[in-house]
Amino acid sequence: MGVFPKENPINVIIAVWPWGSYLGDEGMKNGIRVKISSFSRPHINATMVRAKTVANYANSLLAKREALKDGYDEAALLDTDGYVAEGSGENIFMVRNGKIKTPPLTAILEGITLDSILQLAVDRGYTVAQRKVTLEEWRSGVESGEIV
């Protein structure tokens, strides 16, 4: 077989089920505790980070495990330059001063949810920006209550 399975068949499975609140109803009601993970989001050129493949979730799995072990509800991963990238299983959005910010596609997994949220925000009159977010900017906004 080797690392190039040219002649192997490709099998696809699609599973669908009701999901509910990703971090639970309590998390939605009371908020969650987030740990900045020691694991980072892989660099965009390191592997196929734009594809939702099982192997690309290794860092997210390790980050979530680390957060839970340390008493947190969720993990946030930084990119390889130290900027806020994403949660272990979700995109991160900052709502500050009436503007919605999210990390650029060079640091996060592009997907339907991200596109939908950004489009809905624009449709509702929000200013939206995809740009690098420093950890200090994120922390100061959370601590002051400006970021929700």
Language-model segments: which ranges?
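Helix-start/capping segments and mature chain N-termini
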Residues: 2-148
